UniProtKB/Swiss-Prot annotation:
<feature type="compositionally biased region" description="Polar residues">
    <location>
        <begin position="463"/>
        <end position="476"/>
    </location>
</feature>
<feature type="compositionally biased region" description="Low complexity">
    <location>
        <begin position="1513"/>
        <end position="1528"/>
    </location>
</feature>
<feature type="compositionally biased region" description="Basic and acidic residues">
    <location>
        <begin position="1161"/>
        <end position="1174"/>
    </location>
</feature>
<feature type="modified residue" description="Omega-N-methylarginine">
    <location>
        <position position="1774"/>
    </location>
</feature>
<feature type="region of interest" description="Disordered">
    <location>
        <begin position="1229"/>
        <end position="1249"/>
    </location>
</feature>
<dbReference type="Pfam" id="PF15232">
    <property type="entry name" value="DUF4585"/>
</dbReference>
<feature type="compositionally biased region" description="Low complexity">
    <location>
        <begin position="1113"/>
        <end position="1123"/>
    </location>
</feature>
<protein>
    <recommendedName>
        <fullName>Uncharacterized protein C4orf54</fullName>
    </recommendedName>
</protein>
<feature type="modified residue" description="Phosphothreonine">
    <location>
        <position position="733"/>
    </location>
</feature>
<feature type="compositionally biased region" description="Polar residues">
    <location>
        <begin position="238"/>
        <end position="247"/>
    </location>
</feature>
<feature type="compositionally biased region" description="Basic and acidic residues">
    <location>
        <begin position="829"/>
        <end position="839"/>
    </location>
</feature>
<feature type="compositionally biased region" description="Polar residues">
    <location>
        <begin position="166"/>
        <end position="175"/>
    </location>
</feature>
<feature type="compositionally biased region" description="Low complexity">
    <location>
        <begin position="485"/>
        <end position="505"/>
    </location>
</feature>
<feature type="region of interest" description="Disordered">
    <location>
        <begin position="1090"/>
        <end position="1147"/>
    </location>
</feature>
<feature type="compositionally biased region" description="Low complexity">
    <location>
        <begin position="248"/>
        <end position="258"/>
    </location>
</feature>
<feature type="compositionally biased region" description="Pro residues">
    <location>
        <begin position="1546"/>
        <end position="1555"/>
    </location>
</feature>
<feature type="modified residue" description="Phosphoserine">
    <location>
        <position position="1187"/>
    </location>
</feature>
């Protein structure tokens, strides 16, 4: 898949408009378009993925600087630039010719017209601005991407590109010639990648076949990005401006137009030839469908920019129809889940972010663009931008093939398959494989192109590619038949064609399958086996082999599978072809996802990646590394693809996404041993087919036979096959489990590759497939094939794939498995996990056996998962696949995943119809799993996962399906799996995390290695997944295991049962975050699927999910503890969560959407620390595990949730703890969050009433702050205040961020419920975007868990309040904890009122939860710790101060009596500004919150203030200082105010009711929270200082006092909830701000230069991020790495900048959370200025809050990385938020004035 990361470049010349990321030139100009957007558009489905493959000598335009310097044209030079090791090969490798031969035959020339969004510069797009990207896959050249000058259409452009355009080689040269991308800012470490776009320049301009990828996705602003054609198309949406292919242009135009109309953002339409045109037509149709289905998924997510994804995706899906456009296609996939709910917002965001063509026309001069540079987190290869993970230039040629794959994916698939892709948001495979073939084929056969369905049927042979791409149609559940190519799986008839195509393709290049294969081959030009492209099948085999060799190219396998599938059955064939496509995608995507996300993992598991790739070769470490990189590169794109698929409607996603995921997973598995896999593919295909039939009742024996015979061997291949079949199966699933599988199955299928994800999704019973259903079958298979298997079981077509696949896979599998085993063994030995091998192998068999039965269950669970799950699953699946399935997850993760899945599956439906199919699939999966295990989860997988999890899995199998009864390891695994199942889905959605996954990969891997399998696995898996978790519609998926929960969750979310939902979200969030964070694969499994599904089990795992990384290091048996705890927690607190979840099930999806991308990073850090704290601090305390569910969940899920997690982590955890609490409260989830502190206590706490929990929480906070210092990956018992501060402070900033994110998430949750999470994703993205978004509710639940600590009674009260308040559409004012918990529920119900439910919650949680809930519980224990330790985390401090100050008495008051007030406090904390409802735009809530903010109490006060926000109608005039007085919403505010005031007053430091000063934030930010409108409200109140101090100072008192100067500062405050930006002129009362100096751990009063601006509040609409702040900022919070650095710097320095004021104003809004945590304030501060925000707080908080609140100021990425003075408002673009780097993606927010 070509991942076009179009990094928005602003104001660059048109020539800069296109930027080639990863060797593909992408319009750099799209100022609006974030790299992610482009990635979404192009990258996801189109060329985008290729975009950041290798950095050209010049930094890619995609780099952060990109926005400023828009070297739009990043070309993959024929000679690889510095970073283009692989690309060069791609172009030059002979293998490419073989691989590309067919492609060339097709004349695959993908032309992407990049219309830079020059909205700032000019709204209209000018031809001169448009640049065409020609992506040619030439047999000899490989993928050539060249950008034509904007002047002419493709021809002129091509000419411009150079005469070489016509020739691929020339094109390459030309490309080099063509604008070498100026170095965007090196900030994105991305090497500028040159893409030879001109491989077939001539073809493109001449032959209709040439695909015209018009990536016109820069509507606002750089409209004229690069491609005149695009511009012409764009401008004359209706007319056919492009001379090259007028018909195509027409199509394009129409597509664009429709996109614009639908999304108001025409991403880019891809039409090159009549075929394209036809395709475009179909695409347009699809686009509409996509849009309606949720085209607006978080496309950014897939790139790893959750926020971007969200914004870009919706639009992209809408706009990315023809092109897959991949903001729409790719992005859509990522944001699929959220897109549907958020279409409007997405559009807006895209219009802003992506600058859709329409929006460009009506673009504001002032807009904010977020540029994300995805650096694939290959630890070793920093060159590669994960974000651009389109193609990694690895020394291995994998990158190249990867690139080619993407090129084919993005290119061919983009246009021909684009439609499908678009439709099938699940573009992962489609785009990849299908793209090229499709392009060629599709282009050739216009009819096919016309309609996906039509093409599918019409160009049977050719359409196979298209069919693969056609997955898109699958994606569009509604239009499966139309999605010809992609639909193949869906359409039974089509499969025949695909089969024919497969056969033909095998023989002929033009065949779809062939094309797909070839594309893949193209992708891995240097792949060894690619050389034999003569036979498509052979070629595919070669490709597959090559992939296994080191290319991740699974084309070969795909082809075999494809053909097999086709032969077997039409649907099967289609699926197979899809699979082939997927295979293509998998190499790049899966590798990237698996690899990039677990760059470390891969690096660590060189064997893993290598094993996948290099396995064929000897376990050559070098190759392994290269492979690892390739995997990452591929995986990353894969993630994008996953994201895309997720974006599709659940049904579509289920079908397509599932298969795709499967394919990817397969590819990944295949990657383990391509050749073996090919063999395996054949045998496995047959096997799987048999299994499917068996599942269907047709081939039970055969399936079993195959599986059993090739248990080890078949595993990888079968996994692949099952993947392919999974898709088919998924298509067929509706037959068997239409309703269940349809919605859920597909997700599962998608998860298939992710297996964890799939399992999770299914389960539903993803794990169960492993353990539950098929006690005797291969659990490994179940897990790996879980998603796929379920699908397979359901889909006979999948079965049909069996025979051919079998043959192919048989030998392949043998080789692969043998090699993989060998390599895995080697790897393990390297890692010192030699024992893994035996366990791995034996476990695999075990798993395989267990998985089969489970698989059925999982299938059932899958089916059970509704569309929501499916949708979420798809998206998340993507992540999961790469994380979990990658499928290291399948193998090593498989155990955990299976485990999690197993329980889920059992829950879902042990008696699945697809037992046989599942068995077969399980077998395959087992093989794949094993392979993957070796590949990815070597350490965790093999040793712990395989062994422990397998045991657990077995146990689970035995255990009742409904019961998540996993052994310790198994339990958390099961949890993970279940969470994976439920959260994996979410994970998929969270693509930003994908990018972030890489970093997680690194860490978790290590951690995993250190600890037992269960622990390590859960940690590792969860960690990567955590980021993914967001995507994880785990909440949605929760139902699999706990269908009730799914239902409950949705209602809760929507109906006010936030508890469960939150928990789920939390879980999801956490899981996703973890996944992203660390071992995606591993983490995915760890991803507590159970948490969501089975609250009781999930809980512990939740903790693990959140804390897992920490846990891994912290305690070897943390996992076990987690496992045990989860059950206990499930029993106790979890049930609450379940209840909440049950209530919010409907909203689950939204919750998922809330996945935050931001949290990824922050959470990575935060999670790591908190988790470590849990693991380390909790290593001793088993409860830590238990608590983790509460704590970790919050932490992980929300990134804020870590409040509880943070509890141990003084700074971060301290502040997070409260958040966690709230989450806990939301889910009544066991309050175990305190678990952090309460190792021993934890368990009791979870079970015990709130008091115990509270005590625990308090203890945890105290312990964390006093006893523990969390260093990066672990909690250290002794904490250096400074180091801890530093690290923890980063955490605290993160926590603050998360808290804000939580708050945002909460609000977002509302949104989510309201919009299914699309906004959630964005909104949550505001702050905790990543965490929150994916699992805001979950987080809330987690938080509630913490709050649970406050007390069950409090929780109950909160629930009551929730119920009461829910109608109000405000987060309930119930006690903070309850509020948080309630909020999720309530917010969900009052979706309209997206008010800062979460925001408040976060704040409140931190402050109130920590103070009231946490401290109150253990005021005495917490008091020192809370007050002191919390000081570390300003927020905590705030909370704690109140708690401390207000003894239990007050705490109690607040807690029990003040549930409301807590809520208030919560709200206030975040919003500090008691915003009147959204309507209170003009009202200046007397900043009760601000007032409150003043004192540490401020957090309480702030929270109170927020309640007004919640109340919406209440606009306390009086300063919060009077706490009660200012509260127009007397009840909440008064209540909270009183307690808060009590708290505020009690605290000496807080005592100063600077609230009055702070109160200045009177302007009730009229958050149109409900509206979630992008409005900027000006608040005059000088609450800013208070919040900052609140955030900064443990005792916000000083801050408030500081905030005495009445100079007004204008701040952009973002209502995370509504995503509205308020421009608040807060009097900078105190010129000084209290900033927290992370280095010293002290709060410093820094004189802040307050901008004196109109005091009168003004409401300004901030279109860009306002709508989906999540899309931007939320994606990345301050990254742990950045935080420390930034914090110290920011801590003092940024404060002067608007940041301080911002912090303050955010304080009212988000600052209060920041107040809770110094970070929180700063977090909010980032709104105004990412850098300006109070550095310490702002760093962490800023990223979250900033991202989320990226309002007019677009605090840019709420990354407070470098402090950038955002306050200054010079015209022109400026980086508002400091570049945030989550380890994978560097994102910076640019504000264009």
């Amino acid at each position: 898949m070509l991942s076009f990361h179009f990094w928005k470049s602003r104001g660059q010349p048109t020539d800069a408009a296109s930027s080639v990321a990863d060797g593909i030139q992408t319009p750099r100009c799209c100022r609006r378009c974030q790299a992610n957007n482009w990635t979404g558009q192009l990258s996801y489905r189109t060329l985008a993925t290729v975009s950041a493959g290798a950095a050209a000598p010049q930094p890619q335009t995609t780099s952060t600087a990109s926005s400023r310097s828009l070297p739009t044209s990043l070309r993959l030079a024929a000679a690889p630039p510095q970073g283009l090791k692989n690309w060069e090969v791609v172009a030059a490798v002979a293998a490419v010719p073989t691989a590309l031969g067919p492609v060339q035959i097709r004349g695959t020339l993908l032309r992407a017209t990049l219309q830079p969004l020059r909205g700032q510069r000019r709204t209209q797009d000018f031809p001169s601005d448009h640049h065409c990207l020609f992506l040619s896959l030439k047999p000899g050249q490989g993928l050539i991407m060249e950008a034509a000058p904007p002047e002419l259409n493709s021809k002129a452009r091509q000419a411009e590109v150079g005469d070489g355009v016509s020739s691929a080689q020339d094109s390459q040269e030309l490309k080099q010639q063509l604008w070498p991308l100026p170095k965007p800012s090196a900030s994105s470490q991305r090497e500028a990648k040159y893409v030879d776009m001109c491989a077939s320049a001539e073809v493109q301009r001449e032959s209709p076949q040439t695909m015209k990828l018009t990536l016109g996705h820069c509507p606002g602003g750089q409209r004229a990005s690069r491609s005149p054609k695009e511009k012409a198309q764009d401008e004359p949406s209706s007319k056919t401006p492009s001379p090259q292919n007028n018909p195509a242009s027409s199509q394009l135009s129409r597509s664009q137009h429709s996109a614009s109309e639908e999304g108001g953002n025409f991403s880019s339409s891809s039409s090159s030839s009549p075929m394209n045109k036809a395709e475009e037509d179909g695409l347009s149709k699809m686009e509409d469908s996509t849009t309606s289905t949720g085209a607006l998924a978080t496309s950014s997510s897939s790139l790893g920019f959750e926020s971007e994804s969200g914004e870009s995706e919706g639009c992209q899906a809408v706009g990315g129809e023809g092109e897959k456009i991949s903001g729409g296609g790719g992005g859509g996939k990522g944001g699929g889940g959220g897109g549907a709910g958020d279409g409007t917002e997405c559009r807006d965001i895209i219009a802003k972010s992506q600058g859709s063509r329409d929006p460009p026309k009506v673009e504001e001069a002032h807009y904010i663009t977020t540029h994300e540079i995805q650096l694939s987190e290959v630890e070793q290869d920093m060159d590669f931008d994960v974000g651009l993970a389109s193609r990694w230039d690895f020394e291995d040629n994998n990158v190249i093939y990867s690139f080619v794959d993407y090129a084919s994916f993005g290119g061919s698939d983009e246009t021909p398959g684009d439609i499908t892709s678009l439709t099938e948001e699940d573009d992962d495979n489609s785009c990849y494989l299908s793209t090229t073939p499709s392009t060629n084929t599709t282009r050739t056969p216009s009819p096919t192109s016309s309609d996906l369905a039509r093409p599918n049927a019409g160009r049977s042979g050719r359409d196979t590619s298209s069919t693969e791409v056609g997955s898109g149609p699958s994606d569009s559940g509604p239009t499966p038949p139309p999605t010809g190519p992609g639909t193949a799986p869906l359409t039974e008839p089509l499969p025949e064609t695909p089969e024919a195509a497969s056969g033909a393709a095998a023989a002929a290049a033009s065949s779809c399958g062939s094309a797909a294969s070839q594309i893949l081959l193209s992708i891995k030009p240097a792949s060894r086996a690619i050389n034999e492209p003569s036979n498509v099948r052979a070629k595919q085999n070669i490709i597959y082999a090559a992939k296994h060799e080191g290319d991740m190219s699974l084309r070969v396998s795909t082809a075999a599978e494809h053909n097999s599938s086709s032969l077997k059955q039409n649907p099967a064939a289609a699926v197979a072809q899809d699979h082939a496509k997927k295979f293509i995608a998998v190499p790049a995507r899966l590798q990237t996802r698996c690899g990039a996300i677990r760059a470390k993992e891969l690096v660590d598991y060189s064997s893993g990646a290598s094993s996948a790739v290099s396995e064929l070769d000897d376990a050559d470490k070098e190759v392994r590394n290269l492979t690892s990189r390739a995997f990452r590169s591929l995986a990353y794109p894969y993630f994008e693809a996953l994201n895309i698929s997720s974006r599709e409607s659940s049904t579509t996603l289920s079908e397509v996404g599932f298969g795709r995921w499967s394919t990817f997973l397969d590819l990944k598995c295949g990657g383990v041993g391509a050749r073996v896999e090919q063999s395996l593919l054949r045998s496995s295909a047959a096997s799987v087919a048999a299994g499917l039939r068996k599942g269907s009742g047709a081939r039970a024996t055969a399936d079993q036979l195959y599986i059993q015979s090739k248990k080890s061997q078949t595993k990888a291949l079968e996994f692949v096959v099952s993947k392919v079949e999974g898709e088919i199966k998924h298509v067929e699933t509706p037959l068997c489990f239409q309703k269940q599988v349809q919605t859920g199955s597909r997700v599962v299928t998608l998860l298939e590759p992710l297996n964890v994800r799939s399992e999770s999704k299914a389960s539903s019973a993803p794990g169960p497939g492993r353990a539950t259903k098929g006690p005797g079958k291969g659990p490994g298979s179940a897990y790996t094939d879980d998603g796929s298997e379920t699908s397979e079981g359901s889909k006979p077509t999948s079965r049909a794939d069996g025979p051919q696949k079998s043959k192919f896979a048989s030998s392949l599998l043998k080789n692969v498995i043998s090699k993989k085993m060998q390599r895995e063994h080697e790897f393990k030995m390297e890692r010192g996990e030699v024992m893994d091998t035996s366990h791995h192998l034996s476990g695999t068999s075990k798993e395989t056996e267990g998985a089969r039965g489970s698989e059925r269950q999982r299938e059932r669970g899958l089916q059970r998962q509704s569309s929501r799950h499916s949708e979420a699953g798809s998206e998340y699946t993507v992540v999961s696949m790469s994380d979990a399935g990658g499928e290291g997850s399948v193998a090593g993760s498989k155990s955990p995943v299976f485990k999690a899945s197993t329980p889920r599956e059992r829950n879902a439906g042990p008696g699945r119809n697809f037992t046989d199919g599942h068995t077969e699939v399980c077998e395959i999966k087992k093989s794949a799993s094993e392979t993957v295990k070796g590949i990815f989860l070597r350490s965790q997988n093999s040793a712990f996962r395989s062994w422990k999890e397998k045991e657990a899995e077995k146990r689970e199998e035995q255990a009742p399906i409904g019961k998540l009864k996993l052994p310790k390891g198994g339990d958390w695994r099961a949890d993970l799996g279940e969470i994976s199942a439920s959260k994996n889905t979410i994970m998929s959605r969270l693509f930003v995390p994908n990018i972030q996954q890489t970093p997680k990969d690194k860490q978790p891997r290590k951690q995993a290695t250190k600890y037992p399998a269960a622990q390590a696995t859960s940690t590792a898996v969860i960690r990567p997944k955590a980021p993914e978790i967001k995507i994880r519609l785990g909440s949605v998926q929760q139902p699999s295991s706990d269908f009730n929960i799914a239902k409950l969750l949705t209602p809760k979310l929507a109906g006010g049962s936030a508890s469960n939902l939150f928990k789920t979200i939390e879980d999801n969030s956490r899981a996703q975050q973890k996944l992203f964070r660390g071992d995606n694969l591993e983490k995915v499994p760890h991803f507590q699927v159970r948490d969501i599904r089975d609250k009781s089990k999930a809980q512990g795992p939740l903790h693990q999910v959140r804390d897992v990384r920490k846990l891994i290091k912290g305690s070897g048996d943390s996992s076990d503890k987690g496992s045990v705890t989860p059950e206990q927690g499930l029993t106790g607190p979890k049930p609450r969560q379940l209840s909440a979840a049950a209530g919010g099930s409907g909203s689950l999806s939204p919750m998922v959407i809330t996945c935050q991308a931001v949290v990824n990073q922050r959470e990575d850090s935060m999670d790591r620390e908190p988790r470590e704290s849990m693991g380390k601090g909790g290593g001793s305390r088993v409860l830590n595990s238990s608590s983790p569910e509460g704590t970790v969940l919050v932490h992980r899920a929300s990134g804020r949730l870590p409040v509880a997690t943070i509890a141990p982590n003084k700074p971060e955890q301290g502040s997070y703890l409260p958040v966690l609490k709230i989450v806990s409260k939301a889910s009544t989830q066991k309050t175990p969050e305190k678990l952090k502190e309460e190792e021993v206590k934890e368990e009791g706490k979870a079970t015990k009433p709130a008091r115990n929990a509270l005590e625990k929480l308090t203890a945890a906070v105290r312990s964390m702050e006093e006893l523990y210092s969390f260093n990066r990956n672990e909690w250290k018992r002794k904490s250096d205040p400074l180091p801890m501060m530093m690290d923890s402070h980063v955490l605290s900033l993160i926590a603050s961020e998360e808290r804000e994110g939580v708050v945002v998430a909460d609000g977002d949750h509302d949104k989510l419920s309201k919009r299914l999470g699309e906004v959630e994703e964005r909104g949550t993205g505001n702050k905790a975007g990543v965490v929150l978004r994916g699992a805001p509710i979950e987080r809330l639940q987690r938080r509630n868990s913490n709050p649970s600590a406050e007390s069950v009674s409090a929780r109950a009260a909160a629930f009551e309040n929730l119920a009461r308040e829910r109608p109000r559409s405000l987060y309930i004012p119930p006690v903070h904890k309850d509020v948080e918990r309630t909020q999720p529920l309530q917010p969900l119900p009052p979706l309209p009122s997206n008010r800062n439910v979460f925001t408040v919650s976060a704040s409140s949680i931190q402050k109130t939860g920590g103070v009231a809930g946490k401290f109150p519980q253990g005021p005495s224990p917490e008091s020192p710790s809370a007050a002191k330790g919390i000081k570390s985390q300003g927020l905590r401090s705030l909370k704690i101060s109140p708690a401390t100050r207000a003894p239990p008495d007050e705490v109690t008051n607040r807690k029990s009596g003040s549930n409301l007030e807590k809520s208030n406090s919560d709200c206030e904390n975040y919003l500090t500004i008691p915003l009147k409802g959204s309507s209170a735009a003009g009202e200046l809530l007397s900043r009760p919150g601000a007032s409150r903010e003043g004192p540490p109490n401020s957090s309480a006060a702030t929270l109170c203030s927020l309640p007004p926000l919640s109340a919406r109608s209440q606009v306390p005039s009086s300063s919060k200082g009077s706490q009660v007085s200012g509260t127009s919403r007397p009840a909440w505010r008064t209540k909270p105010d009183n307690p808060r005031e009590t708290v505020a007053a009690p605290p000496g430091p807080q005592s100063p009711e600077h609230p009055p000063t702070t109160i200045y934030h009177q302007p009730p930010l009229p958050f149109t929270l409900q509206g979630a409108q992008p409005q900027v409200l000006c608040f005059s109140p000088p609450s800013m200082p208070a919040p900052a101090p609140a955030a900064s100072a443990p005792v916000p008192t000083d801050p408030f006092q500081q905030a005495q100067p009445q100079q007004t500062q204008r701040k952009m405050l973002l209502d995370v909830t509504t995503g509205q930006y308020y421009l608040v002129d807060t009097p900078v009362q105190p010129m000084t701000r209290r900033l927290f100096d992370p280095e010293t751990g002290q709060y410093v009063d820094v004189p802040m230069t307050s901008q004196q601006q109109a005091v009168a509040p003004m409401s300004i609409s901030v279109p860009p991020l306002a709508l989906s702040p999540g899309a931007y900022g939320p994606t990345y919070m301050i990254y742990p790495g950045f935080l420390p650095t930034v914090l110290p710097t920011n801590a003092l320095q940024p404060t002067p900048i608007a940041r301080a004021p911002r912090g303050s104003e955010l304080s009212p809004m988000v600052a209060e959370p920041s107040s809770k945590e110094a970070a929180a304030t700063f977090t909010e501060a980032p709104y105004f200025m990412a850098s300006g925000q109070s550095p310490a707080s702002s760093t962490s908080s800023a990223p979250a809050a900033t991202s989320q609140l990226l309002g007019a100021k677009a605090f840019a990425q709420l990354h407070g990385k470098p402090v950038i003075s955002i306050t200054s408002q010079p015209l022109g673009p400026r980086i508002i938020a400091p570049p945030s780097f989550d380890g994978t993606t560097m994102s910076f927010v640019v504000e264009h004035r």
